[in-house]
Amino acid sequence: MANVWGVRLADSLSSPTIETRTRQYTLHDLCSDLDANPGREPWKPLRNQRTNNIVAVQLFRPLQGLVLDTQLYGFPGAFDDWERFMREKLRVLKYEVLRIYPISNYSNEHVNVFVANALVGAFLSNQAFYDLLPLLIINDTMIGDLLGTGASLSQFFQSHGDVLEVAAGRKYLQMENYSNDDDDPPLFAKDLSDYAKAFYSDTYEVLDRFFWTHDSSAGVLVHYDKPTNGHHYLLGTLTQMVSAPPYIINATDAMLLESCLEQFSANVRARPAQPVTRLDQCYHLRWGAQYVGEDSLTYRLGVLSLLATNGYQLARPIPRQLTNRWLSSFVSQIMSDGVNETPLWPQERYVQIAYDSPSVVDGATQYGYVRKNQLRLGMRISALQSLSDTPSPVQWLPQYTIDQAAMDEGDLMVSRLTQLPLRPDYGNIWVGDALSYYVDYNRSHRVVLSSELPQLPDTYFDGDEQYGRSLFSLARKIGDRSLVKDTAVLKHAYQAIDPNTGKEYLRSRQSVAYFGASAGHSGADQPLVIEPWIQGKISGVPPPSSVRQFGYDVARGAIVDLARPFPSGDYQFVYSDVDQVVDGHDDLSISSGLVESLLSSCMHATAPGGSFVVKINFPTRPVWHYIEQKILPNITSYMLIKPFVTNNVELFFVAFGVHQHSSLTWTSGVYFFLVDHFYRYETLSTISRQLPSFGYVDDGSSVTGIETISIENPGFSNMTQAARIGISGLCANVGNARKSIAIYESHGARVLTITSRRSPASARRKSRLRYLPLIDPRSLEVQARTILPADPVLFENVSGASPHVCLTMMYNFEVSSAVYDGDVVLDLGTGPEAKILELIPATSPVTCVDIRPTAQPSGCWNVRTTFLELDYLSDGWITGVRGDIVTCMLSLGAAAAGKSMTFDAAFQQLIKVLSKSTANVVLVQVNCPTDVVRSIKGYLEIDSTNKRYRFPKFGRDEPYSDMDALEKICRTAWPNCSITWVPLSYDLRWTRLALLESTTLSSASIRIAELMYKYMPIMRIDIHGLPMEKRGNFIVGQNCSLVIPGFNAQDVFNCYFNSALAFSTEDVNAAMIPQVSAQFDATKGEWTLDMVFSDAGIYTMQALVGSNANPVSLGSFVVDSPDVDITDAWPAQLDFTIAGTDVDITVNPYYRLMTFVRIDGQWQIANPDKFQFFSSASGTLVMNVKLDIADKYLLYYIRDVQSRDVGFYIQHPLQLLNTITLPTNEDLFLSAPDMREWAVKESGNTICILNSQGFVLPQDWDVLTDTISWSPSIPTYIVPPGDYTLTPL
């Protein structure tokens, strides 16, 4: 793809090859033009492309004789008025013509076009025109008739012997609203009077002799191919100028410019069977070339005209309707730096046609064209397929050559081309609803005192931490924060079940008090959660009977100081959203006192057996101590909820069974929850403080930010080395970050802008570079279209990263955390992008292995950075390849699938290969469930029969294995290795990589990624570690043991659950698991740890050895949840009364259950008044269900609410409800299955339409006081005996 200065040409040729025959202009044609019938007018309106208003008119014969100043014609300024004026005038002129030349006699007579144009011009300017009428019909020739006396009849003509001079009449006419606006059409100086003169003769030789004796410094132009109205030369007027900012061009250049653009357009449209009026539309320079230099616009347009004639095409398509803006940009490209890269150069006296040019104009025209056999272009013949503009920047993937430059040169050129400083849009660092975490009281957990619970960070009120919280809040995309938090809290609170009754603590139609209600919510004078709550529109949250509001800022309630006693009344549920910072500010002692007062107010306002929620802004030990002493002994259960919306330590405490004495305590579950909670806060606080400030001006100094450069009129094949280095420098600055390009017009120039983002990861990769690898510009060269720019956005993904991106970020964090300065890394399945180079220290040598070729440069690195293109599961290649740490992420499953291997076989082969290496640590992501096998809808489908994972989003299918099998393979190769199943920590520490790389996170995606990690964990193998022996069943609630040989009596063992210390042998009494004991057998030299666990998950072990307490990894073990089998045993006789039917449920008591209904693919909690779980006298679990006719039309499931992910362990369909036979001899209950209209039929006859606007209750029906529909908002009716069916409408 060649460039002619700044104009880029396509890499193919195309040219018209069939020319239409010239048809003589007759009197009939002239009269038809003078009629100006709609659709056949001798003019064409031209519009402003922005406003769509008609701002100019293009004129055709016979209107091309307007040579006087426009005011002499008396034209109206508006197009509609002008068009009416023209039709009236031309109609009058037509009758004058027909009076002299009756159509019956002269219809097919040939008209002299010169005279026709002059006639119309004279008539419209109210000048004498009758003397021209005798010359209208051609007698000899158009030129011959006017030479001599004929030329004196109009100022339109002038005779010079055998040469006729004709004033070039206007081809365009401005309307009053033409302002030379950027979006107005260009008129090429042809709207000006006397912009050029045409010189006609019967032969070119006569014209040449004439110009020998006349000044031709303005440049004489010629149309060789089918010149209009005869052989002629055109002499532009130097004094007539047209604006093409920043250039002012004369009439000669304007005419050259218009003609070559017409030819370039014709080349693109050319088709083999499509005839054109003229094969070559271009003007060519016949005389005056000696007056123009190669840097002049005239000369360069002459080159472009020659190229267009030869069939070249512009790589950038010419718009159907030109604008001044586009034309200015094109002229700027013509005049930009560069050279003519084609073999064609203009000759003054003839037009060169290359031997292999598709143009046939030299055969169709006998004069002016010479085909050169020795001149060959070597290009394919094909019309360019033009593309429409792209409305936003497009991603660009750089590719590298072997060329290099100094790093300093790259930095220098980036500094010259950069668009910094600029103020980018910040975007959102987090989107979506609350990411909720919770813990509730579990009597099987170990008792914990308030003094053992984690403490609020001492630095919480420091200025930099306040800044971090503020930034996170500003950049967090959320609607009404209170609404999101309140909704999340209510959903969790309403799931709590009283283990003594099997019923939910919170049910429908309970009275509610809302403490801290505010009228300061957008669009409402009350908390936004209240209306959907009352209307039953919050999934899983039944409506209350009433909500009374209290607080400082209420509009629909009572103004009161909630921290002091007040006559509130009793409520079954009290919800307190009071902020302690209103009165307490940042004084912890005051705020703790306020919490105590609020807790007291809530206790007093809650009816016996009721529940309350209190927001705790600052969860300190004094607060926990107060709850421990005053609240826990007077409630039957509790829950702590963190609806993570913004980054703070705020929590919600939920109390159930108020005013009922108990012996509740804090538990180890609360301890683990709070450790995660505070770590999560500190993690995100640290990250937020490293991000640029909200609304910042990016000058390139922040570690995270925008990088953008712009190049004007880029021509890449001959671009300056400096510009290429600048693009390469930007690529070095941003590493693997997404790069987008825009190519557009700006102030008359064609601009390429490349935008990306820098981060600590990209800086790490740049630090590894010794030389700057130079990009291959080919992929940018081919961009002929316009790609419109957009304002840079720091966090640009409005919907947030996908679950797969979040999962990858989790793996990246673990790899980054495992490698230290100087570690030698062997990365398997690197991928073309080699992300590993951004994750490990710049001082760490690395070997990257992948079966695919790398997209990274080579030979430019500071330390050894090697890329091997091979199958890492093959034998023999690893000899001599060093790697202290081996990493393999998101690769082994695909490798196994590609080789049709089981995962066990692929893993075994990998271990076999690595056993011959020098590796000390292997970090490999494996396909292996670490929890109950459960598909993740839309993301992971698990075929447990064939042990296959299917990823629907990618259409991939991979094998998987199990933990025991993989551990066995490892220990066969390395008997003394320690194996750690790297747990996913819920403190979100992995988000550091994501946020500092400007990745927008999504709550929903994180939840899915956390689930996927359970099936695709990281396995860490410390090859030279010390193994542990597991004995017993590592199942929640059961006894199990670890035997650890090879240590001394003074060594200490620590066990971690997520981020928290679960126990230490240094003080087993402080353990956070129900039971642990540690014994050292001096004879065997081994430790035995006996344990009972209450939480399922991954636990990691670490030994502190010797007096220096050197840490040694012992690996990990997994504590499983109890068996998930569940059965439902229905009695032979079902009870259709309000007493309901008792169903025996067999399930491990570890699991808490609730009933759900699945509607339109969405899970909804079923009404607790319909399904109630309780323990029978014998201790078995019983589910009481009240039967409804609608049950046959719904899908009910029992699901566990044990984990953070509802239904993760148990999802059991209640299939009998879809097949029960309804009795016809007793009253039944009937509800609508959903909110659609349903026709109720009895014995086939329609009785009524439920949910219809005109619904009338049948006379023999009654309304049940408390609905037993799955939804508390759908009423239930008592209907008489009958055979009922329901049909949706």
From Swiss-Prot:
Catalytic activity line of the entry: a 5'-end diphospho-ribonucleoside in mRNA + GTP + H(+) = a 5'-end (5'-triphosphoguanosine)-ribonucleoside in mRNA + diphosphate; a 5'-end (5'-triphosphoguanosine)-ribonucleoside in mRNA + S-adenosyl-L-methionine = a 5'-end (N(7)-methyl 5'-triphosphoguanosine)-ribonucleoside in mRNA + S-adenosyl-L-homocysteine
State what changing K44A does: Almost no effect on autoguanylylation activity
Chief localisation class: virion
EC number(s) in its UniProt entry? Answer: 2.7.7.50, 2.1.1.56
Q: Which InterPro entries match?
A: Ig-like_fold (IPR013783), Reovirus_L2 (IPR010311), Reovirus_L2_4th (IPR048604), Reovirus_L2_6th (IPR048603), Reovirus_L2_7th (IPR048602), Reovirus_L2_8th (IPR048294), Reovirus_L2_GTase (IPR048601), Reovirus_L2_MT1 (IPR048598)
Annotated Gene3D superfamilies: Immunoglobulins, Reovirus components, Reovirus core, Vaccinia Virus protein VP39
| Compartments where found | Virion
| Consequence when changing K171A | Almost complete loss of autoguanylylation activity
What is the top EC class of this enzyme, as a single word?
transferase
Highest rank taxon of the organism:
Viruses
Keywords of the record, alphabetical order, are: ATP-binding, Capsid protein, GTP-binding, Methyltransferase, mRNA capping, mRNA processing, Multifunctional enzyme, Nucleotide-binding, Nucleotidyltransferase, Outer capsid protein, S-adenosyl-L-methionine, Transferase, Virion
**Quaternary structure annotation from Swiss-Prot or TrEMBL:** Interacts with protein mu-NS; in viral inclusions.
Describe the function of this protein.
Answer: Outer capsid protein involved in mRNA capping. Catalyzes the last 3 enzymatic activities for formation of the 5' cap structure on the viral plus-strand transcripts, namely the RNA guanylyltransferase, RNA-7N- and RNA-2'O-methyltransferase activities.
Report the protein name in the record: Outer capsid protein lambda-2
Q: From which source organism is this entry? A: Reovirus type 3 (strain Dearing)
